[in-house]
């Protein structure tokens, strides 16, 4: 069975924990888009591990971790991650494979990203400044440097020289920044080449072989669906397609080979950076939500904006991803709220609407229409049995399923992989729940 697991909001939904939990039964985990601009936090037996590029299956012995062609790969970020994992005794090089068609994220991409955000000032998009957007620009413009280019040093030098000269024009004459030296970039890549050369290969062919052996594969998304470059809250989006269709194009795996699409969603909503957020709470409730949820970016450390669950945006996410199941995370964050609110419609320019507008100026003016439910005000932290959950919490989950039309198959009640209620089996999971 082949399953896509992705975020349904603006990222930070808890994908890493769920992927890690499910990898017990899989042969491979695949990253298919994004870069090191988002982190997946895993907590196993109290020990925290943050992954940025390497798939979340790396903590399971024998699970292949594949970086697909849709990822933009920062060599220094990858090496730092490998070293951190090696220090914990994890044999990364034995499990990790990198698509030869994967584009590399290089120093001029980072320099351009930072220069652009600085120029925009108060109108900045709120990127992480890690070069993701410029790296994807080079890919689309067909001037990108790919992992396979590392295998041909002479050709690589010429490509780096041309690309650096091209980007230095913008850096020096438009943004008034110091130009970069192509030789130093090349030298860094040569050091990187020696370390990862054995891991470069044909990920698409490898996935095909696993499929023919009827092995289980997880395709792990980064960021969230509302940050999709085409279908998200443009221009306040990331630079890649974060929706289910990207799992095929970003890995070289045929779209008809996917069996399920699981969407990870918090029991509330968070967002980092600028952009419209209809249910955002700027009052004490929002501060309480952020504090209880420890809502700070795992990579950037930036505080996340918090708000009530948005049924309207979630329905859009379900539609564009063809979700077959929902994983509800961080339910325990809501434990101390006397009242829970669900946004069931928007009021835009005096009209009640049930679809999120693509017009961002209109979306920014939308106000949430709320349905109020009683809170449970008792701890759900660490529960593993659905029948032990407070009645009000079960009512909240049932109402979500009713409004969304998709079953909530897994509920996360804490950060550890053990803090989980599985209501519907995925692969051959032996953890089951009553109720």
Curated annotation (Swiss-Prot):
GO terms for molecular function: adenylosuccinate synthase activity; GTP binding; magnesium ion binding. Transmembrane segments: none annotated. Its main location: cytoplasm. It catalyses: IMP + L-aspartate + GTP = N(6)-(1,2-dicarboxyethyl)-AMP + GDP + phosphate + 2 H(+). Pathway: Purine metabolism; AMP biosynthesis via de novo pathway; AMP from IMP: step 1/2. It holds the Pfam family Adenylsucc_synt. Belongs to the adenylosuccinate synthetase family. This is Adenylosuccinate synthetase.
